[in-house]
């Protein structure tokens, strides 16, 4: 898909579309366990947000926003011929889901929030985003992996998961990671949207998520009418990578209930 840039995706399976939106500073490869495990029940499409993975950017110094990412998701759905989709988003991808719901509600069949939150950043968190943007711009991605890598996993991550996380983080261009950080800093607070979401919702959260404690996620899910909440054991902030079997089972059960 070309419009001064290209948006990449990877797909497997057939049938109604189940789309996946990755977190920061990752790419579509984080969903490999879902592409392989859920292709029998849906046409699974893992997207690269602009600048990530195989997707390009249209400026040397990009400026991102959750709304811009949401519009890109809608464009990708157009490109694959999907009027509607079940859409999953992890962490930053969950922030994109909230924007997608506000901007393109007609494209959403159901929402699957994973290891994310509805609240906007606190002043302290916003300052942290700015430090992250400055750090990657000056030092590259290795220091970010060194600080963030151990925090996104649970207590017993496999070497394979750690290696995949490291590869994705180091493959992300510093200017893209910086733009991500500032976009997350500036995202809207979505707590007021929770009781107004009218499509089916599944909220998955790693029991060992140290970045976004599970109790806050459970409380947010409880504000969405009819939402189902599932805790993923042995999962941290990237639960779909750490425990793909439990994640896939929860998603399969949810989709069967629609």
Predicted features by range, described:
Residues 1-19, 39-43, 78-83, 171, ...:
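Alpha/beta-hydrolase fold catalytic core
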Residues 12, 32-39, 45-88, 249:
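Active-site loop/oxyanion-hole signature of alpha/beta-hydrolase fold enzymes
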Residues 15, 23-26, 91:
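Active-site glycine-rich loops that stabilize anionic/oxyanionic intermediates
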Residues 89, 93, 97:
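Gly/Ala-rich beta-loop-alpha elbow adjacent to hydrolase catalytic centers
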Residues 98-146:
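Flexible "cap/lid" loop of the alpha/beta hydrolase fold
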Residues 121-127, 138-196:
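Conserved alpha/beta-hydrolase catalytic His-Asp/Glu region
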Residues 227-258:
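Catalytic active-site module of serine/aspartate enzymes centered on a nucleophile-bearing elbow/loop
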